[in-house]
A protein has these predicted regions:
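Short, conserved catalytic or interaction motifs in soluble domains
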Residues: 27
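A well-ordered secondary-structure block
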Residues: 102-193
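Short, well-ordered surface patches within globular domains
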Residues: 32-112, 168
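Short N-terminal secondary-structure initiator segments
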Residues: 3-4, 42, 55, 193
Length: 193
């Protein structure tokens, strides 16, 4: 067994004493609260505010469970993968390549990871694939806008998935293609709530 010098022993002992003191104060009694999510900025913040304006009306009409959606970018990875396909190609309509399909397959990993914690709702901003295998096409469907009529259509698209009414969180991504900004969003809620 390796011998410790006095300084190493005292350092180790001091660390152990500090841990015991924390335990005695109840530091290990409960889970630590997660850090507050980063406040949205720029276009993300504007988009979430515009969506929440429409969402609140749906809440008042009894069509959704929560009065507003909280920005939670945990699902952004999945929608960002989709958005980057368009950004990299610099076209809002894309015939999917083998490489694109591999990227889209990565979304399944995000989905599996997210579904451990969240139930997933609807999404808006990207079309369902059309065409035959080898020539499947997807497109960005909503140019970025915070105008009420556009946001209403965007939220209606999210709401096409019936369980979206339970949503409490939203992830957004605003890809820029050929100088135009588009918007993509997905909603979800905590399974443990």
């Amino acid at each position: 067994m390796k011998e410790m010098n006095r300084r190493a022993f005292l350092t180790l002992t001091g660390a152990a004493l500090a841990m015991m003191a924390l335990a005695a104060c109840g530091a290990d009694d409960g889970p630590v609260a997660p850090p507050a999510p980063a406040a949205p900025t720029g276009k993300d913040a504007e988009l979430v505010a515009a969506i929440n304006k429409v969402w609140k009306k749906k809440f008042e009409a009894g069509k959704v469970t929560h009065e507003q959606l909280t920005l939670n970018q945990e699902a952004q990875g999945a929608i960002k993968i989709q958005g980057e396909i368009f950004e990299n190609a610099q076209t809002p309509v894309r015939t999917l390549t083998t490489e694109d399909m591999k990227k889209l397959f990565d979304i399944q990993e995000w989905k599996i990871s997210l579904e451990k914690k969240y139930a997933l709702g609807g999404a808006a901003g990207i079309s369902e694939p059309t065409g035959e295998e080898g020539s499947m096409e997807i497109s960005l469907t909503f140019e970025y806008s915070c105008e009420d009529a556009v946001v209403q259509k965007f939220v209606d698209k999210i709401m096409e998935y019936s369980l979206s009414r339970e949503a409490e969180f939203i992830s957004v991504y605003c890809p820029v293609v050929q100088g135009k900004t588009y918007m993509i969003a997905t909603v979800f809620w905590n399974k443990k709530a």
